[in-house]
Regions:
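Short, well-ordered alpha-helical microsegments
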Residues: 96-100, 158-159, 194
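Alpha-helical substrate-recognition element adjacent to the catalytic core
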Residues: 2-115, 119-120
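Acidic, Mg2+-coordinating phosphoryl-transfer loop and its flanking beta/alpha structural elements
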Residues: 88-93, 147-188
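Substrate-recognition "cap/lid" segment bordering the active-site pocket of phosphatases
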Residues: 97-149, 180
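Short acidic-hydrophobic, aromatic-tinged amphipathic segments that line or gate anion-handling sites
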Residues: 112, 184-193
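Short amphipathic alpha-helix with an adjacent loop that forms part of the alpha/beta core around
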Residues: 195-203
Length: 204
């Protein structure tokens, strides 16, 4: 796998969905919506930002919840095993202000993500994407310098990355996404995902 890079989504693949956990903490069901439910990321984020403002919730409120979260069971061991075999880059639509506690618990893997915009009191006023469709463009850029790319994710916002990669694999996606993209193989356990990655590396 020396000429391969594995690109992984973060939330739902290695860590819990941050917005779902925050929604449960503050008891606002609308904040439970994720890219597994709404395919348009801008629509989703503007909805989230509006709900935060309506309820007087700030970035520190979200960060407090994140500090109490751990990676998904088995995620750190899976990531360690994968990094022994090849290079791994996490491509995520999360934000730098959310990521640090989880990156520390995962052993500081390489992460490409986005940034939240806040005012002086921590109110979230907007967000800044690294670039539009950044996951797909990162895969294309890595391919252009001679790497074969294997990608794994679970949501609508991962599909373009999975289709662009030399091999794309779903990990624990909802049934709606499986039905919509039946050509993408599905894995449910980290052992399955690791095997699927190893098998893909032989064939690409």
């Amino acid at each position: 796998m020396s000429l391969s890079i594995v690109c992984l989504d973060l939330e739902g693949v290695l860590i819990p969905e941050i917005w779902i956990n925050f929604a449960e903490s503050v008891k606002i069901d609308e904040l439970k919506l994720t890219t597994r439910d709404i395919s348009d990321y801008d629509v989703l984020m503007n909805k989230r930002i509006g709900i935060l403002k309506e309820n007087g919730l700030t970035l520190p409120d979200i960060q407090q919840v994140i500090e109490g979260l751990d990676p998904l069971p088995g995620a750190k061991e899976f990531l360690d095993a994968l990094r022994e075999r090849t290079q791994v880059i996490i491509l995520s639509d999360t934000f730098t202000q959310f990521a640090s506690p989880m990156m520390r618990k995962l052993g500081w893997p390489t992460l490409f993500c986005n940034t939240l915009e806040t005012d002086a009191d921590g109110t979230v006023t907007g967000y800044r994407l690294r670039q539009q469709d950044g996951k797909k463009k990162a895969v294309k850029a890595l391919s252009s310098i001679g790497f074969s790319i294997i990608a794994a994710g679970d949501s609508y916002n991962d599909v373009s990355m999975l289709k662009t990669a030399d091999a794309g694999i779903f990990f624990r996606p909802p049934d709606t996404i499986i039905d919509e993209f039946p050509q993408i193989p599905v894995t449910r356990e980290y052992s399955e995902l690791l095997t699927a990655i190893e098998e893909a590396a032989v064939t690409i």
